[in-house]
Amino acid sequence: MTESNLGTESRTATIDNGAFGTRVITFSTGRLARQAAGSVVAQLGETVVLSATTVGRQPKEHFDFFPLTVDVEERMYAAGRIPGSFFRREGRPSEDAILTCRLIDRPLRPSFVKGLRNEVQVVETVLALDPSHPYDVVAINAASMSTKLSGLPFSGPIGATRMAHIDGSWVAFPTHEELVRATFDMVVAGRALPDGDVAIMMVEAEATAHTAKLVADGASAPTEEVVASGLEAAKPAIRELCRAQSELAEVAAKPVAEFPVFLDYSDDVYDAVTELAREDVAEALKIAGKADREEALDRIKARAVEELGPRFEGREKELSAALRSLTKSEVRSRVLREQVRIDGRGPRDIRPLTAEVGVLPRVHGSALFERGETQIMGVTTLNMLRMEQSLDTLSPEKSKRYMHNYNFPPYSTGETGRVGSPKRREIGHGALAERALIPVLPSREEFPYAIRQVSEALGSNGSTSMGSVCASTLGLLSAGVPLKAPVAGIAMGLISDEVEGKTRYVTLTDILGAEDAFGDMDFKVAGTQEFVTALQLDTKLDGIPSDVLAAALQQAYEARQTILEVMQAAIEAPATMSDYAPRVTTVKIPVDKIGMVIGPKGQTINAIQDETGAEISIEDDGTIYVGATNGPAAQAAVERINGIANPTLPKVGDRFLGTVVKTAAFGAFISLLPGRDGLLHISKVGDGKRVEKVEDFLNVGDKVEVEIADIDQRGKIYLDKVRPEGAEAPAEGAAERPAGRDRGDRGPRDRGDRGGRGPDRGDSGDGGDGGEGGESRPRRRTRRS
């Protein structure tokens, strides 16, 4: 299906990137998914996403939240692939799909009318994937467009663009190839205002894995000023996308339908609660401790229900909602008018900080980071690169070396709840903390380990995700990972309201859980002392002025420096690796020798692993990673591998302490180097004594010191036994016996044994066993007729 027949109506948005070319995003509707309330196909290059928005017929009156669901369906056929699962069918959503769901939900949710209780579902299906263009930002625009067409009370459209900082310029909708040269990658969503400006609604951004190298080579570091300029640079693209969506909506959107709106409470309930409890609530909000404060508020709630319940019978939920609204109002008013927060801090103050490393035995690295009542334990595990995570997604990345898992058990907030597989929130928080550390991780060549970082949220009262960033830095350094720089994170909040006829904004540093719930913004910023590594913005407003966000970035920078000082006091440099962590050694071999190291059916590599206790991983380019928990085991494995693939060829006269690997009637085979055996003939085994049977003197596994006596043209090695110093050498031929009486290795022959004829011929020293496998070379006779 080509661009021209994706719909009956279409509009395009054209974004000019100057030297980086133009990007054309097309919105088409009217042909696909016509039974949905609103459907659209969005296309960028050859990336095609179908978005369908549907709405439930009846409202869910018993819900006290807006039931919006966003699903992203990655179809492997979009990339011309068959799923790698057992059933060869797509299963549960990938992490990329879940993160894209969150990207769509965050700007979409605050754009619906307050009090809507009808179920709304937005389903994004990836129909085709251009290898150059990721689908996630296309899906955000598609979701906005299909929702705008559906007739729902929606304040969109919302435009979203990816911005990359490349060679000092901001590029909209960069390709995967261009992102390799980017120092910063940022997804920005917003809506166009009547005055022509753009209000920012959502930001998801990070420095790239190449940032540190690019900056070292002279590129601009993604400082707070650079990031703020990126928010401004995103506005023209967002404005153009909103224009195209609005034009399509004018000709194809359904009229906005009437939906019942369920307000949390009525004015009469709010007035009664305010009159009864305002002073008590104001006093309770001065309690710094979370548990004590919530206990005091619970007592106020119980009293309000008891005293006002008879008056508002059957409206207990309204009483609770009104009390929550009163609490929110008091929190915000105190901040705006007095510059004092719930726990008594000023807007820029940070809660008490503690950082400690090495808190757990046995593990490879561990740390405990606390910020007020937020407590995060970070645990680091190192392993061979073959333990990195394989990815079967539409992303061009096929594996992930650094894996960050975030766990948020219910006890972290003092509550009961479900424990099990991670929820979308946990996946999102883990991904954010992961992206914050990726720019400072050492390369595979510098540190050939797979790294798993687990953040355990043991206590939660504000920004466990940024606490996880700090705990991860400490844990990685504790494990001996040579980070390029330590990273810290901080969560910023925002309170805004009309004060004396003007909208006033107050940015809060290090927000509490209540400030997150009652505030207008959750703005998380992570970075080093030099630049920003990750940030995330969520807002409950229709948008935030970019100058307010720029000021918040600068305020976050100041807080980050304070946190980094505390962390560096706990650990300044990478610690010595744990005794329980594997030591990985890198060996480079010629590609054509990989088969020799592996051996038939893996026999050689398995034997090396079994005998040395090391783990071996082989890359396609001939790089071999050898891991072991102790140095001698790794060294032994490396020597075995080098002996096979990078051998030092032995020469006549070299001495070895070899191992008997096989015995035969004619002698013993001695292992000198991995893959290099030599023959010690039976005549050389007994130190001058008559030898009837090799096993009387040597058995498999015995160590014996030998010297190379000869190497024939085929590379076969013949050995002499090294006699102890002072021992007399046997007389010439003393150890030799007539071939006819002993027959050595000759065995039966078709022509009979010739040994009885004439005098004993014996061997002439070291040349009589030069045949394959050590057999004597038969003498050729010619019969004359």
From Swiss-Prot:
InterPro entries (UniProt xref): ExoRNase_PH_dom1, ExoRNase_PH_dom2_sf, GPSI/PNP, KH_dom, KH_dom_type_1, KH_dom_type_1_sf, NA-bd_OB-fold, PNPase
CDD domains: KH-I_PNPase, RNase_PH_PNPase_2
Positions of region (Disordered): 722-785
UniProtKB keywords: Cytoplasm, Magnesium, Metal-binding, Nucleotidyltransferase, RNA-binding, Transferase
Protein purpose: Involved in mRNA degradation. Catalyzes the phosphorolysis of single-stranded polyribonucleotides processively in the 3'- to 5'-direction.
SMART domains: KH (SM00322), S1 (SM00316)
GO molecular function: 3'-5'-RNA exonuclease activity; magnesium ion binding; polyribonucleotide nucleotidyltransferase activity; RNA binding
Recorded family membership: Belongs to the polyribonucleotide nucleotidyltransferase family.
Residues the record lists as binding Mg(2+): D516, D522
A single Gene Ontology CC term: cytosol
Cofactor(s) needed for function: Mg(2+)
Composition-biased stretches (Basic and acidic residues): 734-764
HAMAP family for this protein: PNPase (MF_01595)
Domain annotation KH: ranges: 582-641
E.C. number(s) listed in UniProt: 2.7.7.8
Residue stretches making up the S1 motif domain: 653-722
Species this chain originates from: Salinispora tropica (strain ATCC BAA-916 / DSM 44818 / JCM 13857 / NBRC 105044 / CNB-440)
Compartments, record wording: Cytoplasm
Reactions mediated catalytically: RNA(n+1) + phosphate = RNA(n) + a ribonucleoside 5'-diphosphate
Gene3D superfamilies, A to Z: GHMP Kinase, N-terminal domain, K Homology domain, type 1, Nucleic acid-binding proteins
Name by which UniProt lists this protein: Polyribonucleotide nucleotidyltransferase
Family annotation (PROSITE patterns): KH_TYPE_1 (PS50084), S1 (PS50126)
Origin: domain of life: Bacteria
GO biological process terms, semicolon-separated: mRNA catabolic process; RNA processing
